[in-house]
């Protein structure tokens, strides 16, 4: 699939790839059995707003190869600014699972980073049992800065073509940037708390809520402490209605 055939939409200065759906995204990342190299970063309204005042995060987003619309507010923003856009929300957790399933079919070597030791072990076991994923190495999130360079070398030596990092943002993006200097020939994806969801330690919103674009509300009801974060998003709503996206 030609790179030029995938439209990009600018939202607050960030170029977001306009994939129509999950299958469209996966077919782009995989050319036959070969997977592209680069970095995947999920974009939502909160990340866009944070990048406005966090120069480091803004630079990380600029350096990423593939920014994709993870938040429903970003999708709606794209559709408002570009009325003919055919773009769908692609939740990071769903993309990761789809990517792992495809990796299992293609035999793509995968390296997992992050999470608690127990959760990581359960993630490995489930991936192997469910999709026969070729996991060539793993490292839980409890490593020191002094261990990082050795970990990069382990990832390189493993021959991994997909590296997923569950450390939260922006730690996982910083990890990706540094690891790519050592092992550029892989697709990197920051996945936040996806391992916890995959193994059942954290409950995700029911499908009906997801389909209605209300996963954010489900999380808010489950974690009322998130209310301050949600209020900050009113700034994005202002951009939306004032056509300043």
UniProtKB/Swiss-Prot annotation:
InterPro entries, per database record: Peripla_BP_I (IPR028082), UDP-ManNAcA_Trfase_WecG (IPR023085), WecG_TagA_CpsF (IPR004629)
Enzyme class: transferase
Protein name listed in UniProt: UDP-N-acetyl-D-mannosaminuronic acid transferase
Database matches in CDD domains: Glyco_transf_WecG_TagA (cd06533)
Entry keywords, A to Z: Glycosyltransferase, Transferase
Name of the gene encoding the protein in the UniProt record: wecG
PANTHER family: PTHR34136, UDP-N-ACETYL-D-MANNOSAMINURONIC ACID TRANSFERASE (PTHR34136:SF1)
UniProt xrefs under NCBIfam families: PRK03692.1, wecG_tagA_cpsF
Purpose of the protein: Catalyzes the synthesis of Und-PP-GlcNAc-ManNAcA (Lipid II), the second lipid-linked intermediate involved in enterobacterial common antigen (ECA) synthesis.
Pfam families the UniProt entry points to: Glyco_tran_WecG
Family recorded in the similarity comment: Belongs to the glycosyltransferase 26 family.
Protein's pathway: Bacterial outer membrane biogenesis; enterobacterial common antigen biosynthesis
